[in-house]
Amino acid sequence: MKSTTLFMVSCVLIFCVLSHVREVKSVETKAKRVKKVCEKAQVFEQNCGWDGNKTCIRGFNKIKEYPFHCECGIYDAPNSRRICKCKFPYSPC
């Protein structure tokens, strides 16, 4: 009888605790804000090659700009030129 009563009281207490849980909103701090991304397009000599993303990143690195993501596309096929559209973590634009 004691164990049954203890079990019932435990269940009621757990139910009460779980029913009073509130949703907590996160506080936005300066460190957690989403930073804006700068996008820039540049035409380079040569084609995209096997890995256009890395080819574009190397092309921008040569001109002292450091993107974190690039997409390579053909700009002028007869002259073997590519266009790189890259995203930068800060604004070189």
Swiss-Prot record:
The keyword Disulfide bond applies. Flower buds. The keyword Secreted applies. It holds the Pfam family SCRL. Disulfide bonds join 38-93, 48-72, 56-84, 70-86. Keywords: Antimicrobial, Disulfide bond, Fungicide, Plant defense, Secreted, Signal. One of its GO terms (cellular component) is extracellular region. Residues 1-19 form the signal peptide. It comes from the Eukaryota. GO terms for biological process: defense response to fungus; killing of cells of another organism; signal transduction. Its main location: secreted. Belongs to the DEFL family. This is Defensin-like protein 229. It comes from Arabidopsis thaliana.
